[in-house]
Every structure is written in structure tokens, then in C-alpha cells.
């Protein structure tokens, strides 16, 4: 009798918690109001089906739910970075087998952009492993932006921290997006990186916004953080004024030789929840299913699309880590009857 009573109490308590989560989520702030971390955590706590249903509703209000954008990311300068980001094999602080390379020349970048466009990408991102770009590096990157944009591709670069005048020069060159991720919540951040402050990141995003460039800003999950840190990251992003136009959500790719190698993997459904919460809190953003996709099976990727992801990075590599082959992506999208934006291929 006592055991049955305990089971009943446990059942009632669990149901009460679920109902509480529903009530809090229903009372979440209207768009434009601030998201408290508790509000975001309440979304994470919803039953999985309820969360995905709500995310899909929000997604359909702002996007065609059966269309995704294909993006390609090219490392234009690999390795030798001064930062000590615990997840990154390009850091000079870690022995991950990535050799420092010079900045690619313009023609090689343009060849890669042409190939990306031919394969259906409408967005071309260029990443350089710098703490911040030096003057001698910025002008070649500006040339890359101009030439890639002239091909009709949406352009994005990620070069590290930017000064206000550097952001303005990139804007003048026609840059569409600048990527600078927050990585995680302010509270967990110090466990991942020590060479750049959270405020440094926010300052760069501010310079990008002031220059009139679209902001691409997201984070990485699966770095050993608690759900509260994931909620804190989403709250930080959603409370930007305005929130980012582009929100990449990365699942940690563990690389031998980096401090985060061996971290316990994130529950796959928790990753889907993160996508869904990003969609609900930032309804008009492009939510990009980014690093870590190579380790995801097709069913998990399909759930991410259901949760509101509407962009994938397309091509064999994301900077230095693996990514699904393009033909696998095309086959998956075809099976799901999902169209690639602007591509009839």
C-alpha cells in the first residue's frame, strides 16, 4: 500500500511539474519583451511533443516549413589561433594535429565558391582562425567578399573580434553577415575559454550591428554544460535588440588533443530541444543546423527540421571537422520532400 501511494505521489508530482512547465511557457513574454532564463528553461522542460508542436507552429508563421537554405563554410586561414577555446582544434594552445596555414589566395577561394554554388549553396561563409584580423589581412578578405558576392551568393565571414572601423569596411564591401558566436551562457563561458571575455564578444557583435551588417550568432552545446547554461545562451541571444538574423546551433565535435575531448555526449533529444527553443524565442531568425551533423542519423536531422531548423551547412568539411557528403544531404532532403532554397538541381 505504501509503495502504491508513493508511486501515485510520484505520478502526480511529475504531472504537476509538466503542467507547471506548460503554464509558464504559455505565459512566456511576447515577442519584443525580455526572455528570462527561467522562461527559456520552462520551454526546455515542456514535454517533447508539445515543444516540437509549438516550435513548428512558430516556424510556419514565418517560413516555408519545407524549404531550407544550403550554406557552405570554407576555412580561408586554418590553425595557429591565439585563443584557447577548449573545443577548437585550430587553437595554438592545443595539440590537435592542425597545422597553421597562410591565408588562401583569392582564386582558390573563388574556385571553392563556384563549386559551392554549382552544388546548390546560396550562402558562402569564410572563416579565418584569428583572434582578430590584422590590417594586412583585412584587405584580401574584403576582395574575397566583393568577388563572392558578385557571383550572386550571400556572403558571411568569421574573422574573430572586430573594431568598429573594420566592420564598416566589410559593410562597404557588401558583406551580408558576420558570424561571431557567444558559444555558451555567461556563467559557463569561463570553463571554455579564458583568452577572450564574454563582453569582448558582445562588443564585436555591437560593432557589426552598428555597421548595418546582419548578425550571425549562436553557440555550441554538448560541452559538458547543464541545461541551465543552454537556457542562458538562448536567453542572451533572444534578448539582443534585435536578436540575430542567423543563429547557428552547433553540437560539439570532439577532437582528440582538445580539452573537451572525452566530454560526455549530449542526449540527441536535448539537441533537438535546443533547436526548438531557439526557433520559439527567435521566430524570424534563420536557425542553422551546424557542426556535429555528421554524427547525427537521418531521423535525428529530420526532427531538427521539425523543430524549426531551416538551414544546413553543406559540403565535406566545416572548417576542420567532418560534415556529411553533399549527395547524402540531397538524398535526405529528397526523402523528406524538403526543397533547397533557390536551387532546382
Swiss-Prot record:
Keyword Transport: no
Residue ranges occupied by any Radical SAM core domain in the UniProt entry: 66-293
Reactions catalysed according to its record: (4R,5S)-dethiobiotin + (sulfur carrier)-SH + 2 reduced [2Fe-2S]-[ferredoxin] + 2 S-adenosyl-L-methionine = (sulfur carrier)-H + biotin + 2 5'-deoxyadenosine + 2 L-methionine + 2 oxidized [2Fe-2S]-[ferredoxin]
Keywords annotated in UniProt: 2Fe-2S, 4Fe-4S, Biotin biosynthesis, Iron, Iron-sulfur, Metal-binding, S-adenosyl-L-methionine, Transferase
Residues annotated as binding [2Fe-2S] cluster: 125, 156, 216, 288
Alphabetical GO biological process terms: biotin biosynthetic process
Keyword Metal-binding: yes
Function: Catalyzes the conversion of dethiobiotin (DTB) to biotin by the insertion of a sulfur atom into dethiobiotin via a radical-based mechanism.
Stated name of the protein: Biotin synthase
Amino acid at each position: 500500500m505504501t509503495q502504491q501511494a508513493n508511486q501515485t505521489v510520484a505520478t502526480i508530482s511529475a504531472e504537476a511539474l509538466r503542467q507547471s512547465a506548460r503554464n509558464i511557457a504559455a505565459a512566456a513574454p511576447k515577442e519584443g519583451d525580455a526572455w528570462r532564463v527561467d522562461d527559456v528553461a520552462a520551454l526546455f522542460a515542456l514535454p517533447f511533443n508539445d515543444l516540437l508542436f509549438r516550435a513548428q507552429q512558430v516556424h510556419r508563421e514565418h517560413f516555408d516549413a519545407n524549404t531550407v537554405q544550403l550554406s557552405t563554410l570554407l576555412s580561408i586561414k586554418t590553425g595557429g589561433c591565439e585563443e584557447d577555446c577548449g573545443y577548437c582544434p585550430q587553437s595554438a594552445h592545443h595539440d590537435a594535429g592542425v597545422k597553421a596555414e597562410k591565408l588562401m589566395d583569392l582564386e582558390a577561394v573563388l574556385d571553392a565558391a563556384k563549386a559551392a554554388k554549382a552544388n546548390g549553396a546560396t550562402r558562402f561563409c569564410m572563416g579565418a582562425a584569428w583572434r582578430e584580423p590584422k590590417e594586412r589581412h583585412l584587405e584580401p578578405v574584403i576582395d574575397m567578399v566583393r568577388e563572392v558576392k558578385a557571383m550572386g551568393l550571400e556572403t558571411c565571414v568569421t574573422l574573430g573580434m572586430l573594431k568598429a572601423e573594420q566592420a564598416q569596411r566589410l559593410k562597404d564591401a557588401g558583406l551580408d553577415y558576420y558570424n561571431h558566436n557567444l558559444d555558451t551562457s555567461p556563467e559557463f563561458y569561463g570553463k571554455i575559454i579564458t583568452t577572450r571575455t564574454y563582453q569582448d564578444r558582445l562588443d564585436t557583435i555591437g560593432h557589426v550591428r552598428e555597421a548595418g551588417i546582419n548578425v550571425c550568432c549562436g553557440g555550441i552545446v554538448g560541452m559538458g554544460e547543464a541545461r541551465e547554461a543552454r537556457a542562458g545562451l538562448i536567453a542572451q541571444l533572444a534578448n539582443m535588440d534585435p536578436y540575430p538574423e542567423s543563429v547557428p546551433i552547433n553540437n560539439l565535435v570532439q577532437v582528440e588533443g582538445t580539452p573537451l575531448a572525452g566530454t560526455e555526449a549530449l542526449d540527441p533529444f536535448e539537441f533537438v530541444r535546443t533547436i526548438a527553443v531557439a526557433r520559439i524565442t527567435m521566430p524570424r531568425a534563420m536557425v542553422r543546423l551546424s557542426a556535429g551533423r555528421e554524427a547525427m542519423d537521418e531521423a535525428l536531422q529530420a526532427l531538427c527540421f521539425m523543430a524549426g531548423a531551416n538551414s544546413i551547412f553543406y559540403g565535406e568539411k566545416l572548417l576542420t571537422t567532418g560534415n556529411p557528403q553533399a549527395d547524402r544531404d540531397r538524398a535526405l532532403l529528397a526523402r523528406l520532400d524538403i526543397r533547397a532554397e533557390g536551387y532546382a538541381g
